[in-house]
């Protein structure tokens, strides 16, 4: 299944952001966002900042587009392997066809991913608008595309996903030669000709899926957000103490969702994926009440929902900003191509295993007919949003330097798209001239180790035009043992 083909193609046709900084490339290089973002960048982060104004005299309207970002993180794999993973995703996005992995390469890749947590996100801001006025407050709207992936597999699950019917889990292989079929013992010493004739792998004493996958999980979601928000001053004296409030929300169109966890309590899995990706579910699709077929060139959404944001902030002596917010409280109802798993014995599979380093393709190995999971169709599935709570503060030291801190925590880490644990960050921005902004910071937590974000931003004609580039971790460009690989960019932001 080409789960992120269309979305990735869109992103790379224009050439981030993890949810702690949203789509705001201006905040990525600092590692902090809650008290730094304004205009439409604050949607989903701190809508009360819409009441602060643009920060540029005489300019009330902000427009932006062509802002995007991506990032890949792991608690065990280094940046060289993560770049290899992202390269495989990019090859798929561009439609290039590298040489498929042979059995030895599949075995090596399985070893890399076993017990390794891997997180990836892709974000694109299609369009953003904000109008901010001291008397009326500020309103904002933007359209954002977001893809989130997190996976961690035990050794046996990884082996089956990458090697398919050739996995060491199976003790027998069925081969077809000149129209005749027979069973042979599975062995690491089989010839290439024999391996090419294998049609399925089977086991004489099978295990239940929950036993095979115990300790494994995948949480993935691809959503389109139509965000809106309003923020304004509530009370206070500008030069001493001012309190601002904000409210926001979003309409959510979901293109794909996969939520699986296997532990001592058993195996849990629900999925809903747009038919644009042509997953062959086999006969189970015929009895699924939520089955739909693809028509047209654009992928059909499989779920719709909403999210609500609430925020409060204060500015003291025009220097110290403090803010807290709750974001994305709500849910998405999936009612198309909805499936759940049956915890049955795994006796055989017919899939070949992953053909490259792109682990997101494992969803195809899990869902398709002849794959790892036994499926049952469902009418609908309700998924609570990946909501978060955040607090932040920052201090302005004149017009030259600002420093701040952020803490972002998930409401429920089990929801697809959620950060796994609280993330702490500290960072700042240096403005040596009116047109140049340099930023750096630190963040850690979640599945992330120590990361050093950096960024550079150019602001021309008193904020009339702005562009810049940032990275979530500068060390990844210089050290092979770094645990991340990322970038964010914006090339078209205007104020007037």
List each language-model region with its residue ranges:
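Absolute protein N-terminus
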Residues: 1, 18-19
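Sec-dependent N-terminal signal peptides
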Residues: 3-14
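Subset of outer-membrane beta-barrel
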Residues: 19-496
């Amino acid at each position: 299944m080409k789960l992120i083909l269309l979305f990735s193609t869109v992103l790379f046709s224009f050439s981030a952001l993890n949810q702690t900084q949203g789509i705001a490339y201006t905040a990525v290089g600092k590692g902090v966002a809650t008290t730094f973002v304004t205009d439409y960048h604050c949607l989903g982060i701190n809508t009360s900042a819409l009441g602060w104004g643009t920060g540029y005299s005489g300019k009330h309207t902000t427009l932006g587009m062509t802002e995007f970002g991506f990032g890949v993180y792991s608690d065990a794999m280094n940046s060289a392997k993560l770049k290899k993973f992202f390269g495989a995703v990019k090859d798929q996005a561009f439609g290039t066809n590298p040489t498929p992995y042979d059995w030895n390469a599949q075995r090596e890749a399985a070893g890399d991913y076993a017990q390794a947590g891997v997180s990836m996100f892709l974000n694109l801001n299609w369009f953003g608008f904000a109008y901010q006025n001291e008397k009326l407050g500020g309103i904002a709207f933007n359209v954002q595309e977001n893809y989130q992936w997190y996976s961690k597999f035990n050794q046996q699950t990884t082996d089956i996903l990458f090697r398919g019917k050739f996995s060491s889990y199976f003790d027998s292989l069925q081969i077809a030669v000149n129209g005749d079929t027979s069973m042979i013992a599975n062995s690491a010493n089989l010839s290439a000709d024999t391996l090419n004739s294998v049609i399925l792998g089977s086991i004489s004493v099978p295990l239940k899926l929950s036993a095979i996958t115990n300790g494994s999980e995948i949480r993935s979601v691809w959503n389109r957000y139509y965000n809106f928000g309003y923020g304004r001053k509530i009370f206070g004296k500008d030069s001493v103490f001012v309190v601002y409030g904000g409210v926001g929300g979003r309409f959510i169109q979901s293109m794909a969702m996969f939520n699986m966890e296997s532990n001592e309590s058993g195996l849990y899995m629900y999925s809903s994926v747009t038919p644009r990706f042509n997953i062959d579910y086999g006969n189970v699709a015929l009895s699924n009440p939520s089955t739909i077929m693809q028509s047209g060139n654009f992928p059909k959404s499989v779920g719709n929902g909403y999210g609500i944001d609430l925020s409060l902030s204060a500015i003291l002596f025009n220097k110290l900003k403090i803010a807290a917010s709750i974001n994305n409280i709500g849910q998405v109802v999936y009612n198309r191509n909805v499936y759940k798993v049956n915890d049955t014995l795994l006796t055989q599979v017919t899939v070949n295993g992953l053909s490259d380093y792109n682990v997101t393709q494992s969803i195809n190995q899990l869902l398709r007919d002849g794959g790892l999971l036994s499926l049952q169709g469902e009418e609908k599935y309700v998924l609570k949003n990946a909501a978060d709570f955040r607090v932040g503060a920052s201090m302005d030291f004149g017009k030259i330097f600002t420093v701040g801190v952020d803490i972002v925590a998930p409401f429920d880490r089990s929801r697809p798209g959620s950060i796994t644990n609280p993330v702490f960050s500290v960072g700042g921005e240096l403005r040596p001239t009116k047109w140049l902004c340099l930023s750096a910071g630190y963040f850690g937590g979640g599945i992330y180790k120590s990361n050093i974000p950096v960024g550079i931003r150019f602001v021309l004609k008193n904020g009339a035009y702005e562009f810049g580039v940032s990275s979530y971790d500068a060390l990844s460009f210089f050290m092979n043992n770094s645990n991340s690989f990322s970038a964010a960019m914006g090339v078209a932001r205007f104020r007037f």
